[in-house]
Amino acid sequence: MATTRKDLRGRTLRKGEMQRSSDKRYAYSYTDPLGRRKYIYANDLVTLREKEAQLTKDQMDGLDIYVAGKATVNFVFDRYMSLKTNLRQTTRSNYLYMYDRFIRDTFGKKKIAEIRYSDVLQFYNYLLDKQGLQANTLESVHTLLHPTFQLAVRDEIVRKNPTDGVMAEIKKSSEQTTGVRHALTIPQQRAFMEHIANHLVYCHWWPLFTVLLGTGCRIGEALGLRWDDLDYERRTISINHSLVYYPVGESRNSVLHISKPKTEAGVRTIPMFDTVKDAFEMLHEEQKESGWNDVEIDGMSGFIFCNRFGNVPNPQSVNRAIKRILADYNAGEEVEAKKQHREAVLLPDFSAHHLRHTFCTRLCEKETNLKVIQSVMGHKDIQTTMDIYAEATEEKKQESFERLAATLDIF
């Protein structure tokens, strides 16, 4: 016959409860879903039973807080990515790159069950203030973390999604226009290109940046261009594929691949301006003398752009080059400004995608037909075109008003 277990004060203990004689603390033992023995402790019996009640509630909800406590954000994100079987390889590559760069080695190591709303808010503010992330980049980080936590909610690992409402708070407190890439001004654009053209180290980048600023191509579309995509007679460029760079295998080493456009709008023919034609002809003459690019990627060859190692450049290397060029330009500008006793005119930080946005802005300043702009840019959604057009025309309107105010005296 089973004996009734009692505490040191003679009170009857329930199954799994005990009181240790060494420190008089109460304990409750149970077996988790993985068959492991677990314990919870309290200094008094009332508190212990409150913890037991909470544990029972969690178990009835299909949630064991102790098992959940072992799962990190990294674990849940990797699980989330493994379930996203319909992702394009380009998108998957971008997701993994963003996560590994900004989340995995810091916030990703935290136990997901211990993260609260304030933790997420603090992390986002850290990325903005300490890491210098732009608002649109933070949006990309949020795009990864929110569905990761949502999966944890659906799997009943956590009760609520701690990322809910965080971006709204960030926008409210910082008053930033998130997700908007601003174009370079015409003086900034000219300063950037003139610096490259006249620089002994960076001048080899001039053709690529000329093509980017003169076509509005996405960086992957530009790097993937082949000589067969050019029609000098019709002065057109065929955009029908893109170059992507993503990690593969357990080593996570990144390799170049060819990707088809995400939408039908991405397949398009765009005009070849004179300066862009000059850039292509310059590269054609160089390869004619030094040897044609013989790199083959997924069955495609004859690529226009080639680095000093004989390989096709990857998008990340282009963005790194932009950062080096900007740093060099701004450092030189500060020296010159000091010599001339004037304020330095520095170039802002930007990426290759800003050059696409810059081209679109210049196009919007000259062209009023939104469907033409949408076709050239390959925008799936006309709203994207309209947003850029509205921003560009608003700036032009302000310039017109300023000129009018300077010449027209009606008072």
Predicted segments with their positions:
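Short, basic (Lys/Arg/His-rich) helix/loop patches that form interaction surfaces
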Residues: E194-W205, I270, E286-V295, M300-V312, ...
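Basic, Lys/Arg- and aromatic-enriched nucleic-acid-binding interface segment
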Residues: A135, E139-T143, R154, V158, ...
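N-terminal core-binding DNA-recognition domain of tyrosine site-specific recombinases/integrases
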Residues: Y39-L45, G69, M81-P162, L200-C203, ...
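Catalytic-site neighborhood detector that most strongly recognizes the C-terminal catalytic loop/helix
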Residues: L243-Y245, T358, M377-R403
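C-terminal secondary-structure termini that scaffold catalytic or DNA-interacting sites
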Residues: T3, R234, Y245-V267, D274-V276, ...
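Short N-terminal "domain-start" leader segments
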Residues: M1-S22
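N-terminal DNA-binding module of tyrosine recombinases/phage integrases
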Residues: M18-S118, E285-M300, E394
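C-terminal catalytic core of Y-nucleophile DNA break-rejoin enzymes
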Residues: K38, D44, T236-S238, P247-V248, ...
